[in-house]
Swiss-Prot record:
One of its GO terms (cellular component) is perinuclear region of cytoplasm. Residues 1-111 form a transit peptide. Keywords: Chloroplast, Cytoplasm, Plastid, Transferase, Transit peptide. It is found in: Plastid, Chloroplast; Cytoplasm, Perinuclear region. Oligomer. This is GCN5-related N-acetyltransferase 6, chloroplastic. Its main location: plastid. One of its GO terms (molecular function) is N-acetyltransferase activity. The gene is GNAT6. The record marks Y261 as: May have an important role in the acetylation of the polyamine. PROSITE patterns: GNAT.
């Protein structure tokens, strides 16, 4: 007797749809149907089984990250007690304070990451999973480690009389600013240094530098100077922390980003004889 079993599998995706997070279970194999073929030869019988895995769209289980309120209204700016903030046009750049702001920053990064791949299958699920992972990573980075400091900077819409907005509709841009220490032997971030048994960090004040990453702006809010002004605020924040050198990496094929950074005062670092860890990017330093 030959037996053929065909099973279906479910996959795990974590998705976000406005005010809901959806979790989908996977790796549970359910028999779909079975075909049995009898085959006899003399007094012997043989039995074989073949399992075929078929991917199907995931089922939905509703839940949300603990403590997040996606309908939470944006509090008035004075309630944050922020002295370090930068107003420009209809927006304000400052450090994120609320979990809902961290989440929206993570979602903007997910949108940016998958922007050129919108036709891929299950792209919305991938974006939502990316956003959840980035949300947790932002909170972890902002707690600091080894004396290093990281801030999630956001651009939010200014308050308007008689208009109430939720937090997730107020945040229109984001970036990360890290205050780091050069590794022993480094003269710029990402430089290849001679391999050592133990890698040490020189925590002298003069060996600190600022590093900007994860800059993105909501598609609906672009071409309003948000990216440039967030960069200016980040540079000024680094200087207020006693850091003069501020760096950013940009992909060599991303001419739009290169133009943005150079317009804001960044210039490509001529590493020359030095080796960089990443040959696909340029290192830029703020010089103005």
């Amino acid at each position: 007797m030959s037996t053929i079993s065909i099973h279906r599998t479910e996959t795990l995706r974590i998705t976000h749809a406005r005010s809901r997070i959806f979790r989908q279970r996977y790796r549970r194999t359910i028999p779909l149907w079975k075909l049995t073929i009898n085959s006899r030869s003399s007094d012997t019988s043989k039995k074989e089984e073949l399992s075929v895995q078929i991917s199907i769209p995931p089922q939905v289980d509703q839940s949300r990250p603990e403590g997040l309120r996606f309908d939470r209204l944006q509090p008035p700016e004075p309630e944050f007690g922020h002295e370090d903030r930068f107003e420009f046009g209809k927006f304000v750049a400052r450090e994120a304070m609320l979990d809902e702001e961290y989440w929206t920053a993570a979602w903007l990064r997910a949108e940016s990451h998958w922007e050129d791949r919108s036709n891929e299958r299950y792209v919305d699920n991938y974006k939502r999973k990316f956003a959840e992972q980035e949300f947790n990573a932002i909170k972890r980075r902002c707690k600091g480690m080894q004396g290093q400091k990281c801030s999630c900077i956001v651009a939010v819409k200014k308050e308007e009389k008689h208009i109430k907005r939720s937090v997730i509709k107020s945040v229109v841009g984001t970036l990360d600013l890290s205050i780091r220490y050069f590794l022993q032997g480094e003269t710029f971030p990402g430089e290849k240094v001679k391999s050592q048994l133990f890698c040490s960090i020189n925590q002298e004040g003069s060996n600190r530098y600022g590093y900007i990453a994860n800059l993105c702006v909501a598609k609906s809010a672009r071409r309003q100077g948000i990216a440039c002004n967030m960069l200016r605020f980040a540079v000024e924040s680094a200087r207020l922390s006693g850091v003069e050198q501020v760096y950013v990496h940009v992909h060599k094929n991303n001419s739009v980003a290169q133009e943005l950074y150079q317009k804001t005062g960044f210039k490509i670092v001529e590493t020359g004889k030095f080796e960089s860890l990443d040959d696909d990017t340029y290192l830029l330093q703020y010089t103005s």
